[in-house]
Every structure is written in C-alpha cells, then in structure tokens.
Regions:
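Start-of-domain marker
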Residues: 1-5
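Long, compositionally biased interface segments
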Residues: 136-173
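Conserved polar/disulfide-associated segments of primarily extracytoplasmic proteins
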Residues: 6-148
Length: 173
C-alpha cells in the first residue's frame, strides 16, 4: 500500500524526497515497510559529501556498488526533530497506520555520483526495508548487548538482508 511522499530540506544541507509503502494487517498495524529516499546536497554546500565507505558494508547490488547496514530499531523512541525519520513517521501517522514497537531494518544505499564505489558522494538513492520483530519472538533487548547487536541478531541478519534485497529492484535508464 502506497502511503504517500514528502519533499523537504533536511538540516539546511540537502534536498530530500521520500516515498513510503507498507504491508499491514486489517487494523493498520505495519508488518513491513518500504521507504524509498532520494537525497542530494544543496549547491550551497559544495564541499559536503555523504560518507558510507567508513561505516557500512559494501556489496554489488543491481549491477553497482551499494552500501548496507542492518539494525534492530525501537519505534517507540522519538525521532530527532526535523530528521528524515520524523518525516517518514509523519507519513505513516497521517495515513492512519501504526508502527510496531520493535523493528528489524535494512538500509541499502547507492551513491548516484560515485561510479568508482568509494562510498563518498553528493547524491543518493536510499532504500530502507523494515519488518516487525514480533514474529521472531525476540525483543530489541534480546538482540543487543550494551547497545550493539549480538549473536541473536547475527542469526536474523542474513535472511532479513536477503528479503530486503529482493524487495527492491533498481534499473538504470
């Protein structure tokens, strides 16, 4: 189900456009979400770059370099005011849907102006896939230790990543 889009300037640094899709139950409780996000630094910030090569894992997806991060998330935590997460949650709230309290998420990023795959660029296509964690029988606290993912998360990560990669298809024109 397509819930809508938003276009905004993020932190006076970049132009963002996001589109949100969900799979939900009859009570509008989200089971899965698909967040497609385009972001470009503003011309007034010519030196700024997105940095993925230092933190995220590199992979070849859809014929190009992509940067991957998986993590558990607590939807009950308030997003930073003005953040892209706040815009994402506002789309969901306005459409009358509810996020589960605990999610498993995958962020897949392609830097559109980084043909060499360095992890540094000014324009990105970001795709975020999320699933309700409840069907696993685990909680955020069970898959993290001192704020870092643990062996329980590692067991969930590979199948989650495969579902996320298969959820999106990217074709260049």
């Amino acid at each position: 189900m397509y819930l809508g889009a938003d276009r905004f300037i993020l932190k006076e640094l970049s132009d963002c456009e996001m589109h949100v899709f969900v799979e939900a139950d009859a009570n509008r409780n989200i089971r899965r979400f698909y967040w497609v996000h385009f972001e470009s630094y503003l011309p007034s910030k010519p030196e700024d770059r997105m940095t993925y090569g230092d933190i995220d894992r590199r992979a070849n997806l859809w014929g190009a370099t992509a940067w991957i991060r998986t993590e558990p998330a607590q939807s009950s935590r308030a997003p930073r005011p003005g953040s892209d997460t706040e815009h994402f949650r506002n789309i969901i709230r306005r459409a009358g849907y509810a996020m589960p309290p605990r999610m498993m998420t995958v962020r897949l990023v392609r830097l559109l102006d980084d043909p060499k795959g360095t992890g540094y660029g000014r324009r990105e296509l970001m795709m975020i896939y999320g699933e309700d964690m409840a069907p696993t029988g685990l909680t955020y606290e069970a898959v993290t230790t001192n704020g870092k993912t643990n062996a329980r998360w590692a067991a969930l990560e590979k199948p989650l990543l495969n579902r996320a990669i298969n959820a999106f298809h990217v074709n260049e024109r």
